[in-house]
Amino acid sequence: MAHKKAGGSSRNGRDSAGQRRGVKRFGGQSVLAGNILVRQLGTKFHPGTGVGMGRDYTLFALIDGVVKFEKYTRNNKVKTRIHVLPVEAAAAA
């Protein structure tokens, strides 16, 4: 009788893949127009000069340049804005 009794079945044991959100290009990095800067849910980061925002709140570069993160205050809350500065302007700053 070399039989093995059936083991119980688990009702857990599954997981969904991560959605790969987060900052993709950091301050001081060079970017090309169209590069994705941040994937996010809602506006954790706000678009500044040279940055566009997609339907899903993805921030992307509109121009070639250098990424700059800036903290600012609005309604007594500290928020973060992301700019893409042209290479000449970034060198001067």
From Swiss-Prot:
Designated name of the protein: Large ribosomal subunit protein bL27
Protein family membership: Belongs to the bacterial ribosomal protein bL27 family.
InterPro entries to which the protein is assigned, alphabetical: Ribosomal_bL27
Cellular component terms (Gene Ontology): cytosolic large ribosomal subunit
Gene: rpmA
GO terms (BP aspect): translation
Keyword terms, alphabetized: Ribonucleoprotein, Ribosomal protein
GO MF annotations, alphabetized: structural constituent of ribosome
Species: Solidesulfovibrio magneticus (strain ATCC 700980 / DSM 13731 / RS-1)
Disordered, as annotated region: 1-26
